[in-house]
Amino acid sequence: MLIVASCSNALAEEPTALEAKLTKGSVAEVMVDFGDVQYSKCVTKSFTIENGTDTPIVLLDYDTTCRCTWLTLPKAAIAPNESAEVTITFDSRGEWGSVGNFLSIETSNKSCKVAVWMSAEIVR
């Protein structure tokens, strides 16, 4: 999955599965669909964030709408025109039916934002 980050308050193009690019003047969005997930299982997917700016960017932290979903962010800065892998993990314990969560990634460039949308269908 490739995610591109941008630097502004404007939304980028429609979110695409596992892809995003950081560029000046937009919010990079990515959509992660886990599909059917067995109840009480943890599942993981990865996506790539590409730095389309002219300065290195560090992915500092993230916020999530649910403690059942978390990210593993790279520790090193992403150089211009380079990319880094981010891992998203979803724990289906305590969830059922259709699940959707939103995560936002804070970067070292305050005008560069990444929005991650996650969905899953919990089956028993």
List each model region and its residues.
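Short, solvent-exposed loop/turn segments enriched in Ser/Thr/Gly
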Residues: 39-46, 93-102
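Short strand-edge motifs at loop-to-beta-strand transitions and within beta-strands
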Residues: 32, 45, 82-88
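Beta-sheet-dominated interaction scaffolds and their linkers
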Residues: 10-52, 122-124
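Terminal connector regions
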Residues: 96-124
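Surface-exposed binding patches on compact interaction domains or structured appendages
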Residues: 54-82
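Bacterial N-terminal signal peptides
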Residues: 1-6
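Short, acidic/polar linear motifs in exposed loop/turn regions
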Residues: 52-55, 94, 109
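Buried hydrophobic-core signal for structured, non-transmembrane domains
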Residues: 45-51, 88, 101-106, 118
